[in-house]
UniProtKB/Swiss-Prot annotation:
A Gly-cisPro motif from one monomer fits into the active site of the other monomer to allow specific chiral rejection of L-amino acids. It comes from Streptococcus dysgalactiae subsp. equisimilis (Streptococcus equisimilis). Gene3D superfamilies: D-tyrosyl-tRNA(Tyr) deacylase. This is D-aminoacyl-tRNA deacylase. A motif (Gly-cisPro motif, important for rejection of L-amino acids) lies at residues 136-137. It is an enzyme of class 3 (hydrolase). An aminoacyl-tRNA editing enzyme that deacylates mischarged D-aminoacyl-tRNAs. Also deacylates mischarged glycyl-tRNA(Ala), protecting cells against glycine mischarging by AlaRS. Acts via tRNA-based rather than protein-based catalysis; rejects L-amino acids rather than detecting D-amino acids in the active site. By recycling D-aminoacyl-tRNA to D-amino acids and free tRNA molecules, this enzyme counteracts the toxicity associated with the formation of D-aminoacyl-tRNA entities in vivo and helps enforce protein L-homochirality. One of its GO terms (cellular component) is cytoplasm. Its EC number is 3.1.1.96. Belongs to the DTD family. Its main location: cytoplasm.
Length: 147
């Protein structure tokens, strides 16, 4: 899995002008699924996301997790995180999982996150518009194959 975590004051995702999901303080996740992702990748990503201390404490130090601040997650599927830009000027996305597998994996990922924090989400495969107010900004890239 490849994920981009953005600490936000608020975020929303819309489809055809209608809001599909929205949160206040928390994390916007852009989620890419690879063809060889397995249960271990899912468990690792969920554990990291819910426990990562990237929210400020009373002293202004990044010392609190999303659970500590009682924040929410807005999860948006994004196969383009697997873009291969080595050849030419048009990215190839052959490194991403096939849609059927990726959709099921994305659903399980969100279900497991929801065991810890409230999760809003976009619609897998839809053309979405994402709005956010970054907080910091704090942006973290997480690749489950690099641990």
């Amino acid at each position: 899995m490849k994920l981009v975590l953005q600490r936000v004051k608020e975020a929303s995702v819309s489809i055809d002008g209608k809001i599909a999901g929205a949160i206040n303080q928390g994390l916007l996740l852009l989620v890419g699924v690879g063809p060889d992702d397995a249960a271990e990748d899912l468990a690792y990503a969920v554990r990291k996301i819910v426990n990562m201390r990237i929210f400020s404490d009373a002293d202004g130090k990044m010392n609190q997790s999303i659970q500590d601040i009682k924040g929410s997650i807005l999860s948006v599927s994004q196969f383009t995180l697997y873009a291969d830009t080595k050849k030419g000027n048009r990215p190839a996305f052959t490194g991403a999982a096939k849609p059927d597998m990726a959709s099921q994996f994305y659903d399980r990922f969100n279900e497991q996150l929801a065991d810890f924090v409230p999760v809003e989400r976009g619609v897998f495969g839809a053309d979405m518009q994402v709005s956010l107010i970054n907080d910091g900004p704090v942006t973290i890239i997480l690749d489950t194959k690099c641990h």
